[in-house]
A protein has these predicted regions:
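Iron-sulfur cluster-binding electron-transfer modules in prokaryotic oxidoreductases
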Residues: 1-286
């Protein structure tokens, strides 16, 4: 377990590790993350040369292929922290934060130089809600959500990082929200990266159970901290014909989710500012 860096004063400059899916598919989540941090007086820098952290290859057992990506990540972010150009690295993903802060030391165990650098960097790498609550001491961020909101605890976030109290505290402080606890909130949604491809039948069954539990909660939206789980859950909710949608917690905390934008009878999901066009396209095709 990585021991997290302690700060004598609140960090005021961080590097954003944006992650592949946020960068390529959900840039609005990355922008919401930046907005959220800047509202707290934190300057955000974005190392443009960053790439995949290597997690897909690592999880598939291709460690030799994952190591160059791990070294590159360390080479990009570690000097920024070491030279005090930034105070910390923040990512809007429990899954990728787990990879870079926990598994890099295992992956680079036979490379003493990189192993030490990875441990140093891992201590300064934080998942978004962890950084807001545990480091900045913030729970109230000026968010409002006029509707019923549930929460899905993503696996890496909960089981590897031990983060659960932090996102719940942030959501609890949202003005106007009615928080509803779904059955099995801590149960896996069935995505699991390559698991969803290699074991699609099991993955779908797990996702359907999650979608059914969400429907029973009668929530307008489900907040979570990983866009990979968000993608999987939304696919199953759409297939099940549910109007509820999963949204990243950064979108909730920056007021980008509006369930009251139009009457429920007129929409198949809550409106998300900057949402992918396919949500609207699916509605037209239907």
């Amino acid at each position: 377990m990585t021991h997290k860096k302690q700060f004598d004063s609140p960090p005021r400059r961080v590097a954003l590790f944006v992650t592949c899916m946020v960068d390529m598919i959900y840039p609005e989540v990355g922008m919401a993350t930046v907005e959220l941090l800047e509202r707290q007086g934190v300057e955000v820098v974005f190392p443009a040369e960053q790439t995949c952290c290597g997690q897909p290859a690592f999880n598939a057992g291709f460690w030799d292929e994952a190591r160059p990506l791990a070294r590159r990540f360390v080479d990009i972010f570690e000097p920024l922290v070491r030279q005090k150009q930034v105070d910390a690295v923040v990512a809007p993903s429990g899954s990728c934060t787990t990879m870079t802060s926990h598994f890099y030391q295992l992956l680079l165990d036979d490379e003493p130089g990189y192993r030490e650098r990875a441990a140093f960097l891992g201590a300064a790498t934080f998942e978004l809600t962890e950084f807001l609550v545990d480091v900045l001491g913030v729970t109230e961020v000026g968010a409002r959500f006029d509707g019923r909101l549930s929460y899905h605890a993503c696996c890496h976030l909960l089981r590897e990082l031990g983060i659960d109290r932090q996102p719940r505290a942030l959501l609890d402080a949202v003005e106007g929200v009615e928080l509803v606890e779904m059955t099995g909130a801590e149960e896996c949604c069935g995505f699991g990266g390559l698991f969803a491809i290699k074991n699609s039948g099991i993955s779908t069954a797990m996702g359907q159970r999650k979608a059914q539990n969400i429907a029973k909660s009668d929530a307008d939206a489900v907040a979570l901290c990983d866009v990979s789980c968000m993608t999987h859950i939304n696919g199953l909710l759409s297939r099940e014909g549910q109007r509820c949608r999963a949204v990243h917690i950064a979108q909730v905390l920056t007021n980008q989710v509006d369930v009251a934008a139009r009457p429920a009878s007129a929409v198949s999901e809550p409106e998300v500012k900057g949402a992918p066009r396919r949500w609207q396209d699916d509605k037209v095709k239907g």
